[in-house]
Amino acid sequence: MSLIPSIFGGRRTNVFDPFSLDVFDPFEGFLTPSGLANAPAMDVAAFTNAKVDWRETPEAHVFKADLPGLRKEEVKVEVEDGNILQISGERSNENEEKNDKWHRVERSSGKFTRRFRLPENAKMEEIKASMENGVLSVTVPKVPEKKPEVKSIDISG
């Protein structure tokens, strides 16, 4: 993640992408000592930054987020400040029994938030979201491009 602040007021994962506005995580990629890896209550940064693909088609902007193990009730899709698409949610820790002995904790838990500045051609009032098999799909239709009106002129003579 970039340590360079965005000119748009947030932090970006890619300094060349003005639309990516991820929440800054100073511990992203930080390796924990092996002794801490067995602590079941520890939040893991891998889920904090859920992976999202953003594809633009002629008709829409399509976002796909991998959110394995989450139900749609645990995920929020919101538009704030008129053009910021925010995807957020939380995965809870698994219940721990007193007699349980954890050998390895690799599945992540905790909160995540991803934010994207949508371009001016996005139709905010027509955004649709669906979730299937742990993949969130958000479709943001685009305003159709105005094609220049061409008027044919008769040539006399």
Curated annotation (Swiss-Prot):
InterPro entries: A-crystallin/Hsp20_dom, HSP20-like_chaperone, Small_HSP. It holds the Pfam family HSP20. Coiled coil: none annotated. SUPFAM superfamilies: HSP20-like chaperones (SSF49764). Its main location: cytoplasm. GO terms for cellular component: cytoplasm. Keywords: Cytoplasm, Stress response. Gene3D superfamilies: 2.60.40.790. It is found in: Cytoplasm. Belongs to the small heat shock protein (HSP20) family. May form oligomeric structures. This is 17.6 kDa class I heat shock protein 3. It comes from Arabidopsis thaliana. The lineage of its organism: Eukaryota, Viridiplantae, Streptophyta, Embryophyta, Tracheophyta.
